[in-house]
Amino acid sequence: MSERRQDYKRHGSRYKARMRAVDILFEAESRDVDPVAIIDDRHKLARDTNPIVAPVAEYTETIINGVAVELDTLDVFLAEHIAETWTLGRLPSVDRAILRVASWEMIYNADVPVTTAIVEAVEIASEYSGDKSSAYINATLDAMASKVETLRERAANPEAVLAEASESLDDAPVAPWDDSDALDDSDEDFEAVDAAEVFEAEETVEVSEVAEDSEVSKVSEEKADES
């Protein structure tokens, strides 16, 4: 594990909840499944006698449920503000997940200061993607922050947002990430945080994991057989 990963211990539970939300959104897109279903699966696995995953924090679940409900509106807003040289569908999926978490907090969670949502997103991007991703994520969220009150007003009428969205907007995800167009810091650099190293001394924080299809399917099948 890199030294930068170990520094991640210094953050509070909200930061860790955001990171786990990013992990779950990334996994959901990679596996083409509902992120809410992943949350339900994690809850079941965490209740096992010998759990292989940590419980999902309440704030992680709040983020996932919020993003799942408002995904179309969030993607319209992100597509409107992303740097002209990029489209939402062509970004690494982990960067899309980071942008969706942060934009949901900025627009739908009044308890989180806009600046906090941006700073946390940029730092998560530096953990998972690198400086290049951090830069355009920061620029995109800053652009949204300058119009956040307008975006909140528009978000109150999602049907109108979707109706007004131009056909040219990139409704992500449109296709698997194209390596030929990838940033230097692509999805290949995204790795799960080692739960044992990161959280061994903490009881209430979240474990960041992106489970592979085979592992999750195997556990789920075993539990189904036992029941």
Swiss-Prot record:
This protein's GO CC annotations: cytosol
Alphabetical list of Pfam families matching this protein: NusB
Keywords: RNA-binding, Transcription, Transcription antitermination, Transcription regulation
Protein's UniProt keywords contain RNA-binding: yes
SUPFAM superfamilies (UniProt xref): NusB-like (SSF48013)
GO terms for MF: RNA binding
Location of region: Disordered: 165-189, 201-227
Basic and acidic residues bias: start-end ranges: 215-227
Acidic residues composition bias: residue spans: 178-189, 201-214
Taxonomy, superkingdom: Bacteria
GO BP: DNA-templated transcription termination; transcription antitermination
Function: Involved in transcription antitermination. Required for transcription of ribosomal RNA (rRNA) genes. Binds specifically to the boxA antiterminator sequence of the ribosomal RNA (rrn) operons.
Database matches in HAMAP family: NusB (MF_00073)
Family: Belongs to the NusB family.
Name of the featured protein: Transcription antitermination protein NusB
Organism the protein comes from: Corynebacterium glutamicum (strain ATCC 13032 / DSM 20300 / JCM 1318 / BCRC 11384 / CCUG 27702 / LMG 3730 / NBRC 12168 / NCIMB 10025 / NRRL B-2784 / 534)
Lineage, top ranks: Bacteria, Bacillati, Actinomycetota, Actinomycetes, Mycobacteriales
Gene coding for it: nusB
